[in-house]
Amino acid sequence: MSRYRGPRFKKIRRLGALPGLTSKRPRAGSDLRNQSRAGKKSQYRIRLEEKQKLRFHYGLTERQLLKYVRIAAKAKGSTGQVLLQLLEMRLDNILFRLGMASTIPRARQLVNHRHILVNGRIVDIPSYRCKPRDIITAKDEQKSRVMIQNSLDSFPQEELPKHLTLHPFQYKGLVNHIIDSKWIGLKINELLVVEYYSRQT
């Protein structure tokens, strides 16, 4: 299944706020109206919607998300928590959380078009897994810096998660440590996502 490129507002109206996909938010009460029209949801539907929420927020294909679930299942610790950490430490998401891109699709464009360096080297793979002490910077070109500055200008600094440090005037971000679960930027029940995939096998 390919990455979603359709109407974004339609998705947030059904699934709730997806800040990685779009800065728009559903109108107050719209999710309650949708629930009343749809009636009581089945457990399968609830798990499916949590999975879709995760997929659309991080901009993943079905195959990519399944791959992350399998990696998380083999790691030590809670599968759901490890899954969220893996997704949060992707380069495209780190750029978004730093405020260097307004959405994850925008961050992916910056990476694909070679505007971003990690530890002084250009990285053009959005799924690159960032590590503690990684230094993320904009390429030293006017075009790269203008694109990032536009995002930084509208980014509320108080929303910067604790595992990251931003130096806006240097167009530089630092990864201090692996993200703590309370700083995940999405309202999600990750256990339902794990359950969804465990029931598919």
UniProtKB/Swiss-Prot annotation:
Region (Disordered): 20-43
Localization of this protein: Plastid, Chloroplast
Claim: Ribonucleoprotein is one of the keywords in the record: yes
InterPro entries: Ribosomal_uS4 (IPR022801), Ribosomal_uS4_bac-type (IPR005709), Ribosomal_uS4_CS (IPR018079), Ribosomal_uS4_N (IPR001912), S4_RNA-bd (IPR002942), S4_RNA-bd_sf (IPR036986)
Major location (coarse): plastid
CDD domains: S4
GO cellular component: chloroplast; small ribosomal subunit
Pfam family name, one: Ribosomal_S4
SUPFAM superfamilies, per the entry: Alpha-L RNA-binding motif
S4 RNA-binding domain segment(s): 89-150
Coiled coil: none
Protein family according to the UniProt entry: Belongs to the universal ribosomal protein uS4 family.
Known partners and oligomeric status: Part of the 30S ribosomal subunit. Contacts protein S5. The interaction surface between S4 and S5 is involved in control of translational fidelity.
Biological role: One of the primary rRNA binding proteins, it binds directly to 16S rRNA where it nucleates assembly of the body of the 30S subunit. With S5 and S12 plays an important role in translational accuracy.
Protein name in the entry: Small ribosomal subunit protein uS4c
Designated gene of the protein: rps4
